[in-house]
A protein has these predicted regions:
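Low-complexity, intrinsically disordered short peptide segments enriched in small/polar/basic residues
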Residues: 1, 11, 63, 114-115
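N-terminal Rossmann-like dinucleotide-binding module
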Residues: 1-48
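Structural signature of beta-strand start/N-cap positions in the alpha/beta core
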Residues: 5, 29-30, 49, 65-68, ...
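Structured helix-beta-strand junction loops
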Residues: 25, 88, 114-115
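Beta-loop-alpha module in the N-terminal Rossmann-like domain of NAD(P)-dependent dehydrogenases
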Residues: 51-111
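Basic phosphate/pyrophosphate-binding loop/patch that engages nucleotide-derived ligands
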Residues: 110-118
Length: 119
């Protein structure tokens, strides 16, 4: 099986937990992280030995070395951040909750279908 090259959007507590989980999976490689500023992206990347460090979510979403992105931001930002990544052609894992209401979830799934990427 090919390795999935992951990016993590956000650098908070849930991002740390996800990075730890990825570290034990044989078919996953943590390639990039994105934050709203370079300092937090660098600190997260140092902790998890990540090469690509992005000072914006937009930059992470367009990283050609990333196949899938885990959205680790507050619930209220899940829709915007997930759609940003989906529009860039990335598979997205966004959870707990996917969105803050059904309308947002439907919009997210609509973009995923339109772009033919996994959500």
């Amino acid at each position: 099986m090919d390795r999935i090259r992951w990016g993590i959007l956000g650098t908070g507590r849930i991002a740390q937990s996800f990075a730890e989980g990825l570290s034990i999976l044989p078919n996953a490689e943590l390639r990039a992280t994105g934050s709203r500023n370079q300092q937090t992206a660098d600190a997260f990347a140092e902790r998890w030995n990540i090469h690509s460090r992005h000072a914006s979510y937009e930059s992470l979403a367009t990283d050609p070395e990333v196949d899938a992105i885990y959205v680790a931001t507050p619930h209220s930002a899940h829709m915007a951040n997930s759609i940003l990544c989906l529009e860039a052609g990335k598979a997205v894992l966004c959870e707990k909750p996917l969105a803050i209401n059904g309308k947002q979830a439907r919009e997210m799934t609509s973009v995923a279908r339109e772009k033919n990427v996994l959500l």
